[in-house]
Amino acid sequence: MILFPAIDLKGGQCVRLKLGDMQQATVYNTDPAAQAKSFEDQGFEWLHVVDLDGAFAGHSANGDAVEAILKATKNPVQLGGGIRTLDHIEAWLSRGLRRVILGTVAVRNPELVIEACRKFPGRVAVGIDAKGGKVAVEGWAEASELGIIELAKKFEGAGVAAIIYTDIDRDGILTGINWSSTLELADAVSIPVIASGGLASLNDIKRMLQPDARKLEGAISGRALYDGRIDPKEALALINANRAKETA
């Protein structure tokens, strides 16, 4: 299991939203690159970055901040938000991203995702953001009639590296991960699933280490880390101890 610390970018700053609402943004760090280095120094193995402005605009809007993050950390970085074309994907991967996350385009043009997986094997993830059980697009601003599992199944066998599943109704409000829908999705597809939205405490980390949740690749944590509700050392110690136990 991997715990992915999150950096959400708005106006070049590191922020957290509540329920995906751009009007409810709390600034946590004005220097995203320094935040990325801090997460690396704390012992995290990966970094999850979202260009919030880009998600709404439909194109990269915090490119300078992302470039600075890539220079500041040796950790692999996954980026989502506003990446909608093969050219955008190739440009970001060539700059050092480990993988891109495709959200809106996965709904609008699933064939592009499949083509991207062929062209960049192991480096394309799909972001499924859901509200009320239905997939949301355009930076969570628009709801679709598409079901979560219905969308995920479109990419079975395509080579998608992971599905990042976000429950918008829980994002940024520290109410705990929506375990029922997250595990239902993980059971329905062979693609690794990463849980996002609502991770609130070490109890969520412990829950992820239970046998029925081991199919998950990991979870993303934002506000709980920034607000000090999760101690990085304690969380990573739990994860590493579990990893050692599984490989013993």
Swiss-Prot record:
Keywords: Amino-acid biosynthesis, Cytoplasm, Histidine biosynthesis, Isomerase. Signal peptide: none annotated. It is found in: Cytoplasm. Pathway: Amino-acid biosynthesis; L-histidine biosynthesis; L-histidine from 5-phospho-alpha-D-ribose 1-diphosphate: step 4/9. It is an enzyme of class 5 (isomerase). The keyword Isomerase applies. GO terms for biological process: L-histidine biosynthetic process; L-tryptophan biosynthetic process. The active site is at 8 (proton acceptor), 129 (proton donor). GO terms for molecular function: 1-(5-phosphoribosyl)-5-[(5-phosphoribosylamino)methylideneamino]imidazole-4-carboxamide isomerase activity. It comes from the Bacteria. The keyword Transcription does not apply. Pfam families: His_biosynth (PF00977). Its EC number is 5.3.1.16. GO terms for cellular component: cytoplasm. It catalyses: 1-(5-phospho-beta-D-ribosyl)-5-[(5-phospho-beta-D-ribosylamino)methylideneamino]imidazole-4-carboxamide = 5-[(5-phospho-1-deoxy-D-ribulos-1-ylimino)methylamino]-1-(5-phospho-beta-D-ribosyl)imidazole-4-carboxamide. Belongs to the HisA/HisF family. HAMAP family: HisA (MF_01014). This is 1-(5-phosphoribosyl)-5-[(5-phosphoribosylamino)methylideneamino] imidazole-4-carboxamide isomerase. It comes from Rhizobium etli (strain ATCC 51251 / DSM 11541 / JCM 21823 / NBRC 15573 / CFN 42). The lineage of its organism: Bacteria, Pseudomonadati, Pseudomonadota, Alphaproteobacteria, Hyphomicrobiales.
